[in-house]
Amino acid sequence: MMHDDPNEAGLPPDDAALPDEAADGADEVNPLHHRRIRSFVTRAGRVSTGQRRALDEFGPRFVVPYAAEIPDWDAVFGRSAPRILEIGFGMGASTAEIAAHRPGDDFLGVEVHEPGVGALLKLIGEQDLPNIRIIQHDAVEVLEHMLAPESLDGVHIFFPDPWHKARHHKRRLIQPPLVAHLASRLKPGAYLHCATDWQNYAEQMLEVLGAEPSLENTAADYAPRPDYRPITKFERRGLRLGHGVWDLVFRKRAG
């Protein structure tokens, strides 16, 4: 999930007890789930009246139920177009803005938290954005079961939870098994765009993405922010305070 101000987003303190800590060793069998890497953190969140209304009104059209099978995505979107996956869209403001400025592309947002799903549905209704669909489920399982190899034209992962304490780095989303799986779902020439405001995580991203043999960096190291990625309010505030933001854009090698 995209993180915002840690207090506003309800992030647990980094030294908080985590419910599946004891089960970390149980996932050695499936490398994609190594040490219970998930695309989300379990959090409580209140759904507002407006979000609930949007869930009821727009959910049936724009939310795709999770299923362990690959749907006909052209039928789901009502057309054949370049398809971009976003993992963890938070409250959806950036997703909506990108979709509005790229009407020729289709965007599949994966987010587990209901307030965020409701918030994006509200924006879809207000801005008439027909090129977005949402899956409210763990992105790791969506990748495994709902997306075919070489079916994506791009992947966005903006400001994933940083897990900044060293002992929790194993919980970060960007790790070799997931990156390899993401790369397998990209078409040759398609891109993977990550962004973070934690330098240590940026360094880890650069190392992990650079080690994936099917990907190549589009820059010497970090990329300039692509014009399509909006600057969030939280990011703008951080930049004013002198905090950094790092974008990484890799492409799937041809052949």
Curated annotation (Swiss-Prot):
Pathway field: tRNA modification; N(7)-methylguanine-tRNA biosynthesis
Enzyme class: transferase
Enzyme Commission designation: 2.1.1.33
Any single Gene Ontology cellular-component annotation: tRNA methyltransferase complex
Coiled-coil region list: none
UniProt cross-references to InterPro entries, sorted A to Z: SAM-dependent_MTases_sf, tRNA_(Gua-N-7)_MeTrfase_Trmb, tRNA_methyltr_TrmB_bact
Disordered: region residues: 1-29
Cross-referenced Gene3D superfamilies: Vaccinia Virus protein VP39
Binding site residues for substrate: K165, D197, T232, K233, F234, E235
GO terms assigned for molecular function: tRNA (guanine(46)-N7)-methyltransferase activity
Pfam families assigned to the protein according to its UniProt record, in alphabetical order: Methyltransf_4 (PF02390)
Keywords linked to the UniProt accession: Methyltransferase, S-adenosyl-L-methionine, Transferase, tRNA processing
Bias kind Acidic residues: ranges: 17-27
Binding, S-adenosyl-L-methionine: E86, E111, D138, D161
Active-site feature positions: D161
Reaction catalysed by this enzyme: guanosine(46) in tRNA + S-adenosyl-L-methionine = N(7)-methylguanosine(46) in tRNA + S-adenosyl-L-homocysteine
Transmembrane listed as a keyword: no
Similarity section: Belongs to the class I-like SAM-binding methyltransferase superfamily. TrmB family.
Described purpose of this protein according to its UniProt entry: Catalyzes the formation of N(7)-methylguanine at position 46 (m7G46) in tRNA.
Cross-referenced NCBIfam families: tRNA (guanosine(46)-N7)-methyltransferase TrmB
Name of the molecule in the record: tRNA (guanine-N(7)-)-methyltransferase
Organism: Burkholderia ambifaria (strain ATCC BAA-244 / DSM 16087 / CCUG 44356 / LMG 19182 / AMMD) (Burkholderia cepacia (strain AMMD))
